[in-house]
Amino acid sequence: MPQAVAGPEIERLIQLLGRMPGLGPRSARRAALQLIKKRETLLAPLADAMRVAAERIVVCRSCGNVDTSDPCTICRDETRDPTTLVVVEDVSDLWALERSGAVKARYHVLGGVLSALDGVRPEHLTIARLVERAGEPGVKEIILALNATVDGQTTAHYVTESIKPFGLTVTRLAHGVPVGGELDYLDEGTLTAAIRSRTAF
């Protein structure tokens, strides 16, 4: 076992940073050193922001987004299209779509995808709440913005069947060639999806 090179408080900081996705032990040490070097301008404000976040962050009971208010900022935004619900796997997907500016609708965060391998069943997700929302007056379209994985496709089919009685339009994101992509570098599955979802030019 490697010997500790600093006091327990610094070692704890390194260990906690190392739990972050994409940060291994070496990256965690580098991040900790940067925080320590910039104690006044970075470490103290970050610690304060994290304390406030831990106290105030809540999950929106309507859509599943995280915010400091319930309902969340997006659900309270009256400029959004109330006829469309965009279904995403996780909050990170919601944030990605918001950054793109491509859609100005309401969202529904499932909290994951169905997975027989991982034992994730419909009751582990917010599918029942989605069905309730799909039945609300004025809702006309459900956009399935789920990842193009086997579990994502399984979840999309399950959701589609669950909301079928409402007679809503159900669409999903197009799959295929990314903007700026070269065909030679794409895998066969992506090329097949691109051919099948081709559109008029």
Swiss-Prot record:
InterPro entries the record matches: DNA_Rcmb_RecR, Rcmb_RecR, Rcmb_RecR_Znf, TOPRIM_dom, TOPRIM_RecR
GO terms in the biological process aspect are: DNA recombination; DNA repair
Q: Where are the zinc fingers (C4-type)?
A: 60-75
Under Gene3D superfamilies, the record lists: 3.40.1360.10, 6.10.250.240, RecR Domain 1
Q: Toprim domain: which residues?
A: 83-178
What GO terms are given for molecular function?
DNA binding; zinc ion binding
Keywords, A to Z, come to: DNA damage, DNA recombination, DNA repair, Metal-binding, Zinc, Zinc-finger
Using the record, list the residue span of the signal peptide; answer none if the entry has no such feature: none
Q: Which PANTHER family match?
A: RECOMBINATION PROTEIN RECR (PTHR30446:SF0)
Annotated function: May play a role in DNA repair. It seems to be involved in an RecBC-independent recombinational process of DNA repair. It may act with RecF and RecO.
This one is known as Recombination protein RecR
